[in-house]
Amino acid sequence: MTEGRCAQHPDGLDVQDVCDPDDPRLDDFRDLNSIDRRPDLPTGKALVIAEGVLVVQRMLASRFTPLALFGTDRRLAELKDDLAGVGAPYYRASADVMARVIGFHLNRGVLAAAGRVPEPSVAQVVAGARTVAVLEGVNDHENLGSIFRNAAGLSVDAVVFGTGCADPLYRRAVRVSMGHALLVPYARAADWPTELMTLKESGFRLLAMTPHGNACKLPEAIAAVSHERIALLVGAEGPGLTAAALRISDVRVRIPMSRGTDSLNVATAAALAFYERTRSGHHIGPGT
C-alpha cells in the first residue's frame, strides 16, 4: 500500500490509501475514546460516528451524509455496493494504522463520519405517529441506544426527549442502537414538561411507566387504549419519572414483577411496553 495514493476504484469510489497515523485526513476519526478531544462531542466537532458495516449502511440510508469513511480493505469490499454514488472518500488503512489513529483496536474495521443536521420539532416528529416514546432523564448512552433499537424493532414511530437525556448521536449510543438512532425520528422538547400537554392536546394518551404498586398493570393499560394514539413515558434509572411528568400523564402503568424485584433496566422496561403495544394490534412493519 503506497502512502497517500488516491485510487479510482473500479466502482467509481474515491479510495485513498493511508499509511501514516498522523495524516491530517484522518483527524475526524482521531482519539475516539478521549474525554475532551473525541470528534463526536457536541462542544467540539460534533460529528456523528458510525462504527461497523451494518451501522455504516444505516447511516447511508439516513439523513446523515458521510463526510468520509475510514476502514480496512476487507470492509471496503463488503461496502462497495452501498458506497456506489457516495461522494465521500474512503481512507483505506491497515488495522494497525486504524488502532493508532482512533486509540484502540476496532474489530468492526470501518468508521464513517457525518455532520449533524438540523433537528425537527416535537410537532413535526409526532405528526401522523400512533406510538411515541417519551424519555425523561435517560442519561446513559447504552440505555439510550438500546431504546432506539427496541423502538425500531417494535414499531415505535418517534422518540421525544424531555429534560436530562443523553445525546442520541454520541458514538456509543449510535453503536448500541445498531444505527437506528440515525433512522428513528426524534426531537428534543423545547419546553419541558409543558410539551407533554401539547402531546395530550394533539390526541395522545400519556402512559407513564412507574414501579408504584397503585399503577395499572401494563398489559391491561395498553389493551385499554389499543385504538388510540399513545405516548409511553419512561424515566431515569433509579428516580424514574419526575412528579411533574407523572402528574400530567393520563395513566400510570407498571410491569408486574416477582421475587421482590421492584423494577427493570429502563431499556428492558421500554421494550416490554413497546411489545405490549404491538400485541394490542399496533402494526409491526417490515424491518429496516
Curated annotation (Swiss-Prot):
> Looking at the record, which segments are called Disordered?
1-20
Q: Which UniProt keywords apply?
A: Methyltransferase, Transferase
Q: Which SUPFAM superfamilies match?
A: alpha/beta knot, L30e-like
Q: Quote any Pfam family the record assigns.
A: SpoU_methylase
Q: Does the keyword Transferase apply?
A: yes
Q: Which domain of life is it from?
A: Bacteria
Concerning CDD domains, the annotation shows:
SpoU-like_rRNA-MTase
Q: Spans of biased composition, class Basic and acidic residues? A: 1-12
In alphabetical order, the GO MF annotations are: RNA binding; RNA methyltransferase activity
According to the UniProt entry, what is the EC number of this protein? 2.1.1.-
Which family is it part of? Belongs to the class IV-like SAM-binding methyltransferase superfamily. RNA methyltransferase TrmH family.
Query: What protein name does the entry list?
Result: Uncharacterized tRNA/rRNA methyltransferase Rv0881
Question: What is the source species?
Answer: Mycobacterium tuberculosis (strain ATCC 25618 / H37Rv)
